[in-house]
A protein has these predicted regions:
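N-terminal cationic amphipathic segment used for targeting or macromolecule association
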Residues: 6, 10, 35-41, 103-104, ...
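Single-pass transmembrane signal-anchor helices and their membrane-water interface zones
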Residues: 7, 11-15, 31-53
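Short secondary-structure junction/hinge motifs that connect adjacent elements
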Residues: 23-33
Length: 622
């Protein structure tokens, strides 16, 4: 029999053994938990994020399925970081003030990121049509806020259409109608209009927003003005999106608009990713075979072209172009739409070269249908419609080039850049309309750092004003394009200021409207000389002025230029100048209330009719 001491030792040994087992089991459990935690943590931190776009296979039977797939890929935003670990470490570095914040300017860079004669006059309606808008192309009429017949002046005064008689001092308002109200809609932009060739219909174009579902539309409405004292709404049509530009050609209204895809709405409703035409509640999508899209989208915005009958607003055809969403130029045969983007190239030593590129796509409209006929890729960007011109089967284009080089650094899920350098210049291209090949051109003809500020084509001639706006000096170039592929050119040399608009003024003269070295108004007359382009005379005034070309009165027959101004010394005025072959003379400055952008004027016989916030008839001016 064990003694008490032996029994006590035995119990102590058992307790010690149990404690060791507990410690071992606890260690095993702890180790297991740690291993499990590491596995879970690794799964949480290092498992890659899913970078696959959402599944859209449920729409495979849709005629738009191919387009849906491309839109889905273009609108899907991949995770910025590879996994949670990269996200957390980047956030910690940012908190500490490390990483890209101390590495120069940070930015995300993604390759491919977006950039005949006059119509015949007709003797019906409210008179004979008379053109008052200085259209870029003869017979391709542009919208404005002033139109006229031989009997009446049609003025779009903000949201009211007003009709005045042309009767010198007896001119008077004979009819008006509110055109700013659309049932259930809010107008979001200024309105513009057309007058039909028989002077019986005014067409109003505006952007509007539905008060019900906040859908944006381009609203086109026609008004019967046969009786100016009783103006009546005669029709309307809507296109989803917002307006870019429009033209009226031979009784057809060419409406150019843009529509942005609502990627947050998915593809269940066509209205979220397709432009539509009709009336609210009865809209029809542009057909799938009328939509042109590049294989890789650089934009989720359409340019939409709708061809309408100008009288009844019936749709003749429609087409949409994904990614073509910048400038619009319309010739007698084609609509040209531009798409600008950045072309990125990797160089040695971590350097990156980014060039601004522009794709110009041509759409034929003369057959009564809209048909894509080709496109061309050019270096640089197109400033506006006047930088493009189709003549004799050749598309002439002036672009402003921009090359940027920088060193790129990547780390912690961020992209940083340093040592940024920019080169700018101007190119002239001549493109064959047969195969869209470049058949002639002049590259980098301007002083380094300058861009094209104004361009004007006139038959075989081209005029280009380049400037470095910060310096405020400008050469004006004259190009002879009559013997392609040979191109010859002359320039004025350096002139103080620069022209924001160049205008053929007739009889070999060129009119420049722009700024002097003090950023005030400068109007200059140029002419071609044996050794270059010479300045004949200029007129300068300490005043601000409109840069809206449609606001200028250009009378080539009488060498008259008119525009609204706001002198620094007083209120708004309308300036009227005449060139006598030697100098520009003020022949009648008139006080006129309103913004220079919306001032308009027209000369009929020897009287001038002025429109601002008020109407004035003044004469005789000669």
């Amino acid at each position: 029999m064990k003694t008490y001491s032996e029994r006590a030792n035995c119990v102590a040994e058992k307790i010690e053994l149990l404690q060791k087992r507990r410690i071992r089991n606890r260690a095993i459990l702890t180790s297991s938990c740690l291993v499990l935690a590491v596995v879970i943590l690794a799964a949480v931190l290092f498992v890659p994020y899913d970078t696959s776009p959402p599944d859209v296979s449920m729409y495979r039977n849709s005629p738009y399925y191919g387009l849906i797939q491309r839109i889905n890929a273009a609108t899907y935003q991949k995770p910025r970081y590879k996994n949670n670990y990269e996200f957390l470490t980047t956030q910690m570095n940012n908190v500490k003030g490390e990483g890209f914040l101390n590495s120069g300017a940070a930015m995300d860079m993604a390759p491919g990121t977006a950039m005949p004669d006059e119509a015949p006059e007709m003797e019906v309606g409210t008179g004979t049509y008379e053109e008052v808008t200085d259209n870029q192309v003869a017979g391709v009429i542009e919208s404005d806020i002033l139109k006229r017949s031989d009997k009446y002046l049609f003025r779009l005064d903000k949201k009211v259409l007003k009709i005045y008689t042309i009767a010198k001092e007896d001119s008077a308002l004979v009819g008006s109608v509110d055109v700013g109200s659309v049932d259930g809609m809010l107008n979001t932009t200024d309105l513009e209009m057309y007058l039909s060739q028989d002077c019986s219909t005014v067409t109003i174009i505006s952007n509007c927003l539905s008060e019900v579902d906040k859908t944006a539309y381009v609203c086109v409405r026609s008004y019967d003005v046969t009786d100016p004292t009783n103006i009546q709404l005669s029709g309307s049509i809507f296109v989803t999106g917002s307006g870019i530009s429009s033209r009226m050609v031979d009784g057809k209204l060419l409406l150019v608009s843009k529509f942005r895809i609502r990627s947050d709405k998915g593809f269940a409703e066509e209205s979220s990713f397709l432009p539509q035409i009709g009336t609210p509640g009865n809209m029809t999508s542009v057909p799938a075979d009328s939509i042109l899209a590049p294989e890789e989208l650089s934009s989720t915005q359409y340019t939409v072209i709708t061809m309408l009958d100008a009288k009844d607003l019936e749709v003749s055809d429609s087409a949409a172009f994904l990614s073509y969403s910048d400038e619009i130029y319309v010739s007698r045969e084609h609509i040209f739409a531009t798409r600008s983007y950045a072309d990125n190239q990797k160089l040695d030593g971590g350097r990156v070269l980014t060039k601004t590129m522009t794709e110009i796509s041509a759409i034929s409209y003369t057959s009564g249908t809209l048909e894509h006929v080709g496109s061309v890729m050019l270096e640089g960007s197109v400033k506006n419609q006047y930088a493009m011109d189709e003549f004799g089967g050749v598309l002439r284009v002036v672009t402003s080039t921009s090359e940027q080089t920088y060193t790129e650094y990547q780390g912690n899920g961020m992209v940083s850049v340093d040592d940024w350098r920019t080169n700018r210049n101007v190119n002239l291209y001549c493109v064959s309309m047969e195969d869209f090949s470049i058949i002639a051109g002049v590259r980098g003809f301007a002083p380094q750092g300058e861009t094209a500020e104004s361009v004007r084509f006139d038959g075989h001639m081209a005029y280009v004003c380049t400037a470095e706006v910060v310096v405020l000096t400008d050469p004006v170039y004259f190009f002879d394009l009559s013997k392609l592929p040979e191109i010859s050119y002359k320039d004025t040399g350096t002139i103080e200021g620069y022209s924001s608009s160049l205008v053929n003024f007739g009889e070999g003269y060129l009119l420049g409207i722009g700024f002097n070295e003090n950023r005030c108004l400068k109007i200059e007359i140029y002419e071609e000389a044996a050794e270059g382009v010479e300045s004949v005379c200029s007129y300068e005034l300490d005043a601000t002025f409109s840069q809206e070309y449609k606001a200028y009165l250009i009378d080539r027959e009488n060498w008259i230029i008119g525009l609204g101004i706001w002198p620094y010394s007083g209120g708004s005025q309308y300036l009227l100048l005449q060139f006598d072959g030697y100098e520009l003379r003020d022949i009648g400055t008139t006080e006129l209330q309103g913004s220079p952008d919306t001032m308009r004027a027209v000369i009929v016989e020897d009287w001038i009719y002025l429109f601002g916030d008020e109407f004035k008839a003044k004469g005789p001016i000669f």
